From Swiss-Prot:
Origin superkingdom: Archaea
Enzyme Commission designation: 1.4.1.24
Keywords assigned: Amino-acid biosynthesis, Aromatic amino acid biosynthesis, NAD, Oxidoreductase
Name the record gives this protein: 3-dehydroquinate synthase
One GO MF term: dehydroquinate synthase activity
Protein encoded by which gene: aroB'
Enzyme class: oxidoreductase
Biological role stated in the UniProt entry: Catalyzes the oxidative deamination and cyclization of 2-amino-3,7-dideoxy-D-threo-hept-6-ulosonic acid (ADH) to yield 3-dehydroquinate (DHQ), which is fed into the canonical shikimic pathway of aromatic amino acid biosynthesis.
Catalytic activity annotation: 2-amino-2,3,7-trideoxy-D-lyxo-hept-6-ulosonate + NAD(+) + H2O = 3-dehydroquinate + NH4(+) + NADH + H(+)
UniProt similarity note: Belongs to the archaeal-type DHQ synthase family.
Length: 328
């Protein structure tokens, strides 16, 4: 989960308000109390949540020795890195060896570059700016800076009715768009892209904040390439929204709705990997076709193709593990 911090060591209440309203993850300040009276947010300060020099290090890269010192500090916690003339190569070297590097940046362009270095990017950016628009733009950029996932076409092999069971609707705190949804599966090795309820229907109004994700036992993709059981999710948890082009975004769960409904089983195959998912049997539940458009489960049949993801199977508390695990 990439983060956006703002450096307000030179205190500016108006900029602090902008940063808070933009949803930044933390603020660097000389006195945490200045921020705490405005809103609840992580502070990096001598009296803050994270203490400079103890919980967070700050390093200016000037040569190879300072790079090596930075990597040593990164073993202990986050490191805010400045590169003087803002050159890319030192950051590339650091990002290749640590996932705790935060880049000090002064513009949207610098932030974009830092977030995409070596494709994976830095862990976060620390904005050194007095421009409120830069804060707003970069904060929004970071929220949408999830890595792309490799979606593949699954050819359906089974679509059949089941009995009644408990299914989970994930109501998020975001408005999702057409072509967006969540990756959900019966196993941790393969997922279908389940479309959000953004489509107009004769019988019910759209619920663009909602994904009717499947039965309680299913896995859903969450930030950090982790998974969670649908039944274990709670308000305030983060889940990953995936678009038809593979782009991802982290969103907050506002509510879970678990209700008994008629279910159906959808199974498919991609490159020899089998995927399956138990979903509610209703017109408003949709997977995503290869064209990025929603396909209602009531219209699906064997031979149809939908988007999904193949993953490394085997999970322990949501983390991928290199272990022989058979799920079927």
């Amino acid at each position: 989960m990439k983060q956006c911090w703002v450096d307000l060591s030179c205190w500016n209440k108006d900029l602090a308000t902008v940063a808070l309203e933009a949803g930044v993850d933390a603020i660097v300040v000389d006195d945490a109390a200045k921020v705490n009276v405005l809103a609840k947010v992580t502070t990096i300060a001598p009296n803050g949540d994270l203490i400079p020099g103890k919980d967070v290090s700050m390093v200016t890269i000037v040569d190879k020795a300072s790079e090596e010192a930075c990597l040593e500090k990164a073993k202990l916690g986050p490191v805010i890195v400045s590169t003087g003339d803002w050159t890319v190569i030192p950051l590339e070297n650091l990002v290749a060896q640590s996932d705790r590097i935060f880049a000090a940046v002064g513009s949207v362009e610098e932030a974009r570059l830092a977030l995409t270095i070596l494709e994976q990017g830095v862990a976060g950016v620390v904005l050194m700016t007095t421009d409120p628009e830069v804060i707003r733009t970069v904060a929004a950029m970071v929220r949408g800076a999830g890595a792309k996932v490799p979606l593949v076409p699954f050819t359906l092999t089974v679509v059949r009715q089941l009995g009644m069971g408990d299914r989970v609707c994930i109501d998020t705190c975001s408005i999702l768009a057409d072509g967006e949804g969540m990756l959900v599966g019966n196993t941790s090795s393969a997922f279908f892209l389940v479309h959000a309820e953004t489509i107009e229907n004769l019988y019910v109004a759209p619920r663009p904040f909602r994904v009717n994700a499947g039965a309680v036992h299913a896995y859903v993709l969450t930030p950090g390439n982790r998974t969670a059981y649908l039944a274990d999710l709670r308000a305030g948890d983060l889940v990953t929204v995936t678009a038809a082009d593979g782009g991802t975004e982290e969103v907050i769960i506002g509510r879970l709705k678990i209700e008994k409904r008629p279910l159906l089983l959808v199974e498919g195959e991609a490159g020899g990997v089998k995927a399956g998912l138990v979903l509610q049997n209703a017109e408003t539940i949709r997977l995503v076709g290869l064209d990025g458009k929603a396909r209602s489960v009531v219209d699906l049949k064997p031979g149809d193709q939908v988007l999904g993801m193949v993953a490394e199977g085997g999970r322990h508390f949501g983390y991928a593990v290199k272990e022989q695990i058979c799920e079927q």
